[in-house]
């Protein structure tokens, strides 16, 4: 397992047809912030755009028909996806 950068942002995504619930654990936090966004490309880009460097984002998502396109989008933006 690779050693994580101290500024790594952990992002957990619960994907639904019309929405995504995002759990965001920023460096130094013990409890993630949770928010709900629309399940569209613009909303995902806006979410990832809030972070200083998408390469520091480590995302996990719910695999399935609603998650695969999301995973491809996140990878194209530079995020690590599991």
Residue ranges and their predicted role:
Residues 1-82:
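Phosphate- and other anionic-substrate recognition elements at nucleic-acid/protein interfaces
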């Amino acid at each position: 397992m690779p050693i994580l950068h101290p500024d790594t942002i952990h992002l957990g995504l619960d994907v639904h047809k019309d929405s995504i619930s995002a759990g965001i654990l920023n460096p130094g936090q013990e409890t993630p912030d949770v928010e709900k966004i629309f399940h569209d490309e613009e909303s995902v880009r806006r979410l990832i755009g809030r972070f200083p460097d998408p390469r520091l984002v480590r995302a996990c998502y719910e695999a399935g028909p609603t998650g695969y396109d999301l995973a491809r989008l996140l990878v194209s933006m530079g995020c690590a996806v599991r």
